């Protein structure tokens, strides 16, 4: 996913000149590239967790993503462009040492590129087995995954305006599910909420108390794997498993 944002002071001046309100969030936009029709996001399969035990194959995988980035970001902007790779539930289900090996190799690959990295990043290692490249490559928690999804959905739906109310977020991924929403004020318990503060162009704050919960192992792929295992256990592991829940082409 490639995106950019305007200088906040420039955008504020522009909106003032046009007589537009300033009590809005800064505008995010797709990064401009050689082609205005270049997609701002790309998805490839499989996920990072599939490289457990075969980290030598990560370079070719990551380079597919970097090829897309280079097609969108102008070459002269690469040194000012930070890059982050955030893995989700599939990686959370791996053993710590396996996660770390994948993250470190991923870090080696992107450090060869002319992107911007935090000046404090001196080597490939991170603070723990869930981070590398000083946090530019890491495995995010289920709560972070839910929070980021909630932020993205509400931003894209323009639900952060002064008169708007936010929407809830339910995400069933491949290996986990997340739920995030702002509860009613009388249901808010500060110990269970994430405090989100967004800064508008007029320097006012947009604050939200968000409840987030996550269920590792309850994504669509993980749930189906358990379902097939239960079928095989019940039927004695036959070569063909009768499954009334699938369409004919998948039986």
What are these regions (language model features)?
Residues 50, 89-93, 144-146, 174, ...:
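Solvent-exposed loop/turn segments at secondary-structure junctions
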């Amino acid at each position: 996913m490639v995106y950019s944002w305007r200088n906040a002071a420039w955008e504020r001046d522009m909106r003032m000149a046009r007589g537009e309100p300033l009590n809005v969030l800064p505008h995010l936009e797709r990064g401009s590239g050689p082609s205005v029709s270049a997609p701002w996001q790309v998805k490839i399969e499989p996920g990072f967790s599939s490289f457990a035990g075969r980290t030598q194959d990560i370079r070719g995988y990551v380079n597919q993503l970097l090829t897309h980035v280079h097609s969108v970001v102008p070459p002269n902007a690469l040194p000012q462009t930070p890059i982050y790779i955030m893995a989700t539930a599939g990686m959370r289900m791996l053993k710590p040492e396996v996660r770390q090996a994948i993250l470190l190799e991923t870090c080696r690959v992107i450090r060869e590129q002319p992107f911007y990295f935090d000046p404090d990043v001196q080597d490939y290692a991170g603070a723990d087995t869930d981070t590398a490249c000083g946090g530019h490559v890491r495995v995010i928690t289920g709560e972070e995954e839910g929070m980021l999804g909630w932020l993205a959905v509400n931003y894209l739906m323009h639900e952060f305006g002064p008169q708007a109310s936010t929407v809830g977020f339910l995400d069933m991924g491949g290996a986990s599910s997340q739920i995030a929403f702002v509860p009613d004020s009388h249901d808010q318990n500060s110990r269970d909420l994430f405090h989100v503060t967004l800064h508008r162009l007029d320097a006012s704050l947009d604050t939200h108390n968000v409840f987030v919960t996550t269920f590792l192992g309850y994504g669509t792929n993980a749930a189906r794997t358990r379902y097939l295992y239960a079928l095989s256990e019940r039927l004695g592991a036959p070569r063909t498993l009768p499954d009334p829940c699938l369409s004919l082409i998948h039986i």
